[in-house]
Amino acid sequence: MSLPSALLPTAELHYQSLISEHPHIANWPSSVLNQLRYVLGLSQFVAQTLQRDDPLCQVLPSLLAKPSREQYYRSELAQWLAECQDEAVAQKRLRQFRNQEMVYIAWRDFCASWTLEESLSHLSQLAEALIFESYQWLYQRCCLEMGTPCNAQGEAQPMLIIGMGKLGGGELNFSSDIDLIFTYPENGETQGARRSIANAQFFTRLGQRLIKLLDQSTPDGFCYRVDMRLRPFGDSGPLAMSYAALEDYYQEQGRDWERYAMIKARVMGREMYPQYQELRQMLRPFVFRRYIDFSAIQSLRRMKSMISSEVRRRGLSNNIKLGAGGIREVEFIAQVFQLIRGGREPSLRKRGLLETLDAIAELELLTREQVQDLRDAYRFLRRLENLLQAMADKQTQTLPDKEDDQLRLSIAIGLADWPSLQREVSEHMQRVHRVFATLIGEEDEEEEHTVARHFHELWDMAHKPEVIEHIIEQDLGLSDAGEQIRTITQFKDDLAKRTIGPRGREVLNRLMPKVYQAVFAHPDAEFGLSRVLALLHSIATRTTYLELLDEHPAALVQLVRLCTASPMISEQLARYPILLDELIDPQHLYNPIPLESYQTELRDFLARIPEEDMEQQMEGLRQFKQISILRIAAADIAGVLPVMKVSDHLTYLAEAIVEAVVSQAWLQVSSKYGEPTHLKHRDGRGFAVVGYGKVGGWELGYNSDLDIVFMHDCPVEVNTDGEKSIDGRQFYLRLAQRIIHIFSTRTASGILYEVDTRLRPSGASGLLVSPTDAFDEYQRQEAWTWEHQALVRARMIYGDAPLQQAFANTRHQILCLPREEHKLKQEVVEMRIKMRDHLGGKKAGRFMLKQDEGGITDIEFLAQYLVLRFSHQQPKLTRWSDNVRIFESLMNHQVMSESQALALTHAYTSMRDQIHRRNLLNQSADVRDSQFVVEREQVIQAWQQWLG
């Protein structure tokens, strides 16, 4: 074994660093030292682990003297844990054992000492040992603390841990998560403790502690990322369920993908449980149907479509697992035969994929050549996946971009260079995809209608303007086609200059006639054509998106409809093409998330992203916002949502995002400094976000900023409880700074929101986060009238109950202060004149909907003035922060006549609706001055009555 010259400096650097830190390594046997240099050149994980783990360096040569270690895992780990007196020590020992054995496995893999089967078996047996022995150790401790869980007959009940996916199949990869399900035979209560608890409660607590023992990141690392989402009802389901509850769920609610997942299910340490056979017999009918079940093909086809969508969404390329012909397609091929015929053919009920392929060959369900292609590809790709992950102990299936890593991977797999590896990967994946396409691939469905010949010619003959002119004027019956001709010919010319591969060109040849047919079927084709082609130009080199539109006619129809109606939407889709997936299902597209569900939907959306991956969490927030706004705008265009409801949706979306941003920021800041100690004596975080202006008034538009103010109730003497303790108020300052950072950072998906915090006490020169008492004092002693006007439109959009109450009290009391009428009127009018002079319309013949006389800002100032003037007489006027309900309240309390309140409300909502429409068209907020004449006159009359 030798390294190429390009990798020798890195290997030597790691070697010298190790010798310096652990001099005894120089005494290792020469054969082991030779292997050491080789492995150090290939694996940063091995180098870093040995560097910090001297006990491992002491024993590694003796470990490597054994050709196999899986038979020792359980017994050795049980001895290690027997010496542990508490969970902190157990966590440390488990991680040390895991690191020791993973170095051993990586070493064997890089030195090509094992077959793939030996490597996967060691990885799976190691995981099973860590899971099962941790459970055994914890179960004894929990029984001492809470009593032993028993059934009605007094028989002790164990918790069975079902390993899913590759863990269950004995095919775990190097840096895999582990998917688990917890179950127990019977309900009952604990016995032997001072207070009995239900078995369900016992096993839930046990499960929580087991997850923490394995999953929590410590200075020694972690054992495994534990994923419990495959359990019944997912994240919302109980952590542990009885056999009876499990059986009810799978019989009544089990879905196709759960059948797919359950094929590989295996109980950890199953030989220890007499109850195992009962569980196995219970689950078998759900997984394997007695009849031949061809519906499995369609189910797997849908799952493959979902995976393809995720590949597009995440921008994955060179992915040997999820890409076309990757590991997942080999697994799907095996699964389809298991699901279709496993009920009748016991030989197809194997958990391991290679065993299943053997059975498929024996039953002649595929040709011997096809099975051999699948077997060879699977072995190669799985070994490549393990080596890729063992380089840095990272969970990835994407081939590296860096040249050094490309060379490392090529050498590790036994090839001379990167091009050789690329060829080998490509050949294997092409063979797999051919079998997959034959067996599971999309059925060739006839199009609902044939695309007319002239739409093919619009694409094929685009280089001949005279042909295009004839088609548009004669075949399509459109006059004045000059602009469309230029658009079509320029689009084809531009694409000719782009680097688009053969596959992309082939898709464009199929897609473009369909695009032209859909565009020219629309009455506003002159708008839609340029917008749709501009979008296609932006995604022309991203073949997966072109294929999406080609394969989903409904998505293409929606694309044309939305782009024709709104340049804002077409630009958004062009900038962020992952949104194209949302067009596939029109029923979903035109039904925005229910108002009360935005927070839940956002949490679910972010749950698929590792909590510690802050960059992807930020990206996820932006993607969720874009998807949600697309659905809101689509419903708006379709007339499903009136303008008030559009603003409601945009506001509830913003509130959900604020809550998620605060949670992310809190996690980041508290992990560094701990939490302020005063929180131990109260619920919540002691922090609030107050929304002003449009977000405060439930009146957000598509392009609105967020005007926000931060508050806390932290006492002066409080510090945080982390190792790096800081002053409590300093903690909240850093929290607010982190929140602004998350909102404002420009990622691949842009910024989240523009945020403005200048409405805080003392403006830009004031504290970024105001203590509640200081906020109250400022409002009473120092605030200007315009700041009290702003308070009319303020409400808390995030915060716990004590802060909610404190802010509500301050706002109510300030707004109810008696004010001298003349002075109030003068200050409001002066501020309005100043704003109009600064922001009002300068265009002749145009009316600025917001700032000109008789516009929206005049209406808002009227509402604020009347609340400030009359709330000391009518305190209930302070209840609402939105203008529509303020006018309703003014009418109900006889401050304003019904006719005037309704007229102002109508003027306000009509102008806002026009601004929404113009936002969708990317137009400025001004109209011809012949519009809204009656409404403006009514606003001016009201202004003269109250403020003239």
Curated annotation (Swiss-Prot):
Query: Which SUPFAM superfamilies does this one have?
Result: Nucleotidyltransferase, Nucleotidyltransferase substrate binding subunit/domain
Q: Which reaction does it catalyse?
A: [glutamine synthetase]-O(4)-(5'-adenylyl)-L-tyrosine + phosphate = [glutamine synthetase]-L-tyrosine + ADP; [glutamine synthetase]-L-tyrosine + ATP = [glutamine synthetase]-O(4)-(5'-adenylyl)-L-tyrosine + diphosphate
One of the record's GO molecular function terms:
[glutamate-ammonia-ligase] adenylyltransferase activity
Work out whether the entry's keyword set contains Nucleotide-binding. Answer: yes
Annotated region Adenylyl transferase: the residues are 452-948
InterPro entries per the UniProt record, alphabetical: GlnE, GlnE_rpt_dom, NT_sf, PII_UdlTrfase/GS_AdlTrfase
Q: A Pfam family this protein belongs to? A: GlnE
Membrane spanning residue stretches:
none
* GO cellular component assignments: cytosol
**What broad class of enzyme is this?**
transferase
Q: Which Gene3D superfamilies match?
A: 1.20.120.1510, Beta Polymerase, domain 2 (3.30.460.10), Glutamine synthase adenylyltransferase GlnE (1.10.4050.10), Nucleotidyltransferases domain 2 (1.20.120.330)
* Sorted UniProt keywords: ATP-binding, Magnesium, Multifunctional enzyme, Nucleotide-binding, Nucleotidyltransferase, Transferase
Needed cofactors: Mg(2+)
Chain intervals for the UniProt region annotation (Adenylyl removase) = 1-444
Q: Which NCBIfam families match?
A: PRK11072.1
Q: Which family does it belong to?
A: Belongs to the GlnE family.
Known function: Involved in the regulation of glutamine synthetase GlnA, a key enzyme in the process to assimilate ammonia. When cellular nitrogen levels are high, the C-terminal adenylyl transferase (AT) inactivates GlnA by covalent transfer of an adenylyl group from ATP to specific tyrosine residue of GlnA, thus reducing its activity. Conversely, when nitrogen levels are low, the N-terminal adenylyl removase (AR) activates GlnA by removing the adenylyl group by phosphorolysis, increasing its activity.
Name under which the protein is recorded: Bifunctional glutamine synthetase adenylyltransferase/adenylyl-removing enzyme
- Upper taxonomic lineage: Bacteria, Pseudomonadati, Pseudomonadota, Gammaproteobacteria, Vibrionales
